[in-house]
């Protein structure tokens, strides 16, 4: 018995009703990208493994989808490594390319490759799919769409402020009023690691701290204890529980180190600018536990969460990366960017019924089919109405009226246009209101000139 067809786990098909809602979100994001001066680019779905790997940490690298070589390249497979159970070396021998994990690393490659063709500071936005070999679960997929905005060029906290304001503009326009923009700084995380004795295990420590929203403070402290010792856990616990998110406490603890002072000063300037100008509709706050465990962040870190639904995870995030383009031989070029989690935003809006009611109205008018000659006579009118922006669908065959009206109902058509034999002879049509069932007779000329 044959199995019914299905898509791979962790991926989705999008029905028209779903896609109209996703496009509603995307249109608002795109419009705001343009309002803030960003230009659109695209990069290939495939990147060289040498471009992708080594940029996301060990956990991130393990989630890159690798693509098997084809043709004669398969003959280069390192069979000895496979026999010795060295799977990493074996996979490297049969794969030179992978699916992009995010849009930021491909951007760094793009900027380095096309630097002589770009104007700096270069503000780009990009909306494309990315792939991660993650365990599929609610709000987490193996294929999903990222919507990124980045600035490459001279470093200034104005860029961070503008990106936070961009976030706020989009989420406000989408109807969110319970958003928190969390910010932290990589140098503060480094100072925190030094303070508890984790300076030699910085990446491991940041990876643990980054899990606090998923596994809770108690479990984070337990993992830190395994990594370090009881004294380290005591220091971290005291700081997080008793003086949580106090910039003054951080200044007292770390302010005498130039590295920590840089981060504290930058975040203080960002918060003061935003609070003094009262330019956000949503809340912004400093969060010392915000880590976003990606190895390429070097400065400010940003994350977007909903107060009322933390289960879905972050709705967006980003930060500053000063060294990423240097991996592609473009030195001394800073970057900062943010990403919108389209799929999670969609889930949140769907759960809260935040979408406009008319998004399911796939066309305005359904034309009832009484035969080809009738459609032929109606076609100049149909063509004229389409030029005026009306969305019109002609039922493709002459069949029972109930079936044709049902078709219009299911696609939320507002009106139906009918032309039977009597109307044909009189150059008239019937317009039926699909909402209340009322109908009226009109000349074709009248409809064309004013009715719609």
Model-predicted segments: where are they?
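Acidic, His- and aromatic-enriched active-site or binding-groove loops in soluble protein domains
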Residues: 62-75, 198-219, 306
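Polyanion/phosphate-binding surface patch
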Residues: 45-97
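Short, surface-exposed recognition loops or helix-turn segments adjacent to catalytic cores
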Residues: 178-188, 205, 284-289
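Short, conserved phosphate-binding/catalytic loop or strand-edge motifs used
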Residues: 141-147, 183-191
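A short beta-strand-loop structural module common to alpha/beta enzyme folds
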Residues: 39-45
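Auxiliary tRNA-acceptor-end handling modules of aminoacyl-tRNA synthetases
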Residues: 1-22, 76, 83-92
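Positively charged, Gly/Ser-enriched RNA/tRNA-binding surfaces
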Residues: 21-36, 47-48, 83-94, 102-116, ...
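A generic structural motif
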Residues: 182-183, 205-210, 392-401
């Amino acid at each position: 018995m044959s199995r019914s067809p299905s898509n791979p786990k962790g991926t989705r098909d999008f029905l028209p009703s779903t896609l109209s809602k996703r496009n509603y979100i995307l249109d608002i994001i795109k419009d705001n990208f343009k309002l803030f001066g960003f230009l659109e680019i695209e990069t290939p779905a495939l990147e060289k493994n040498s471009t992708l790997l080594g940029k996301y940490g060990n956990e991130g690298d393990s989630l890159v989808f690798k693509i098997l070589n084809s043709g004669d390249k398969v003959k280069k497979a390192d069979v000895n490594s496979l026999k010795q159970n060295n799977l990493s070396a074996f996979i490297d021998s049969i794969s030179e390319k992978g699916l992009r994990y995010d849009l930021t690393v491909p951007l760094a490659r793009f900027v380095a490759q096309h630097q002589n063709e770009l104007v700096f500071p270069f503000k780009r936005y990009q909306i494309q799919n990315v792939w991660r070999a993650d365990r599929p679960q609610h709000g987490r997929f193996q294929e999903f769409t990222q919507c990124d905005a980045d600035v490459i060029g001279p470093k200034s906290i104005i860029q961070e402020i503008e990106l936070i304001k961009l976030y706020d503009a989009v989420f406000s326009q989408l109807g969110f009023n319970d958003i928190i923009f969390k910010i932290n700084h990589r140098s503060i995380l480094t100072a925190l690691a030094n303070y508890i004795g984790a300076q030699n295990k910085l990446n491991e420590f940041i990876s643990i701290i980054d899990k606090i929203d998923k596994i809770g403070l108690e479990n984070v402290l337990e993992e830190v204890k395994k990594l370090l010792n009881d004294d380290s856990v005591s220091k971290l616990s005291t700081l997080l529980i008793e003086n949580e998110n106090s910039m003054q406490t951080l200044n007292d603890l770390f302010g005498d180190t130039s590295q920590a002072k840089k981060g504290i000063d930058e975040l203080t300037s960002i918060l003061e600018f935003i609070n003094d100008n009262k330019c956000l509709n949503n809340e912004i706050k400093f969060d010392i536990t915000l880590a976003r465990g990606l190895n390429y962040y070097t400065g400010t870190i940003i994350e977007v969460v909903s107060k009322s639904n933390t289960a879905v995870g972050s709705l967006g995030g980003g930060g500053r990366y000063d060294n990423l383009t240097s991996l592609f031989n473009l030195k001394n070029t800073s970057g900062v960017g943010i990403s919108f989690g389209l799929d999670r935003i969609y889930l949140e809006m769907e759960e809260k019924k935040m979408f406009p009611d008319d998004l399911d109205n796939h066309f305005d008018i359904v034309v009832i089919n009484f035969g080809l000659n009738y459609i032929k006579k109606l076609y100049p009118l149909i063509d004229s109405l389409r030029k005026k922006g009306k969305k019109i669908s002609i039922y493709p065959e002459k069949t029972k009226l109930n079936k044709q009206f049902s078709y219009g109902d299911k696609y939320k058509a507002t009106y139906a246009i009918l032309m039977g034999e009597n109307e044909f002879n009189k150059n008239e049509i019937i317009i039926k209101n699909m909402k209340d069932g009322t109908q009226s007779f009109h000349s074709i000329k009248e409809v064309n000139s004013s009715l719609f």
